[in-house]
């Protein structure tokens, strides 16, 4: 019996000490960074909402009728399609979303140090995502960095509310930043889970 226990212990140690691949390491870093960005996005959005005046509260409901520019990207429409998407597709969409915000984050109304840190984290995440894309192409064709998409104003849906233009644009930036970081966190979490065949990647 002691020999059996010893053998099982050795086997368990062998399994748990399997070396982490470079792919897994990069995925862990990427997921950690986007989780941080998602938390910051939620914090900034919450602070901005709490700073609203009473007559600006209707903006919350009206925004639900609007769309972020990123909604026009070819991306999964629900959790089922997300789970069926390839790792490369999820990485590519995540890259495009982060690429957009690398520029637009400079216009977030936040403290200078906090805004600079967000932009820096986005740049680091973008670099990491490109490495992951290159590592997971498997002959699926090249990936071009040439199409940088910059976010622009989202329309005039809020004029009837009577809010000024700067408030409307700031609200849209915060709301879309939070929405897009949630998307990227979901996509990268699912893609990372695919590295573990035994794992349950259900959303």
Curated annotation (Swiss-Prot):
GO BP: animal organ development; growth hormone receptor signaling pathway; positive regulation of growth; positive regulation of receptor signaling pathway via JAK-STAT; response to nutrient levels
InterPro entries: 4_helix_cytokine-like_core (IPR009079), Somatotropin (IPR034975), Somatotropin/Prolactin (IPR001400), Somatotropin_CS (IPR018116)
Keyword Disulfide bond: yes
Broad class of the protein's primary localization: secreted
Entry GO terms, CC: extracellular space
Residue pairs linked by disulfide bridges in the UniProt entry: 68-176, 193-201
Gene Ontology MF, one: growth hormone activity
SUPFAM superfamilies in UniProt: 4-helical cytokines
Pfam families: Hormone_1
Places the protein is found: Secreted
Keyword tags: Disulfide bond, Hormone, Pyrrolidone carboxylic acid, Secreted, Signal
Pyrrolidone carboxylic acid sites (modified residues): 18
Segment forming the signal sequence: 1-17
Transmembrane segments: none
Superkingdom of the organism of origin: Eukaryota
Family the UniProt entry places it in: Belongs to the somatotropin/prolactin family.
Function, in words: Growth hormone plays an important role in growth control and is involved in the regulation of several anabolic processes. Implicated as an osmoregulatory substance important for seawater adaptation.
The protein's name: Somatotropin
Species this protein is from: Verasper variegatus (Spotted flounder)
GN (gene name): gh
